[in-house]
Amino acid sequence: MTGDKPFWETKRLDEMTRAEWESLCDGCGKCCLHKLEDEETGELMATNVACRLLDRRTGLCKDYKHRRTFVPECVRLTPRVLREIDWLPSTCAYRLLDEGQPLPDWHPLVSGDPESVHKAGVSVRGWTVSEDEAGDLEHHLVDRQL
């Protein structure tokens, strides 16, 4: 009986409406942090440097609709693109659902509270800087799981 279950438990990612798809974003902001790639190993290393369009308090894009105008390299996430990238945070709802895992209790869709991602300490709030203020990314590497 699917009527009692939320959409993310009954639909594949490619079956979701645009509104359902967009609501999966928990607002952690971690996908909007710059990463550096080790030239020798190919390993991605996290920084605490956020895209200039990221509102570091809310974890949301300041101009989501026009973001690619200002940040051409910004990825438009789709079910197909999701499988082609390896840098999404381990807590990302898109990634979790694609891997057959449940959403965590702190996810706003589960908790009903958009602040729950921040209260759980899994967002960028409080430990990031804007790329406009950061300088060299190498000076902003963090030993933190994204």
From Swiss-Prot:
One Pfam entry name: CxxCxxCC
InterPro entries attached to this UniProt entry: Puta_zinc/iron-chelating_dom (IPR005358), UCP006173 (IPR008228)
Signal peptide as annotated in the record: none
Domain of life: Bacteria
UniProt record similarity statement: Belongs to the UPF0260 family.
Protein name as annotated: UPF0260 protein Swit_2819
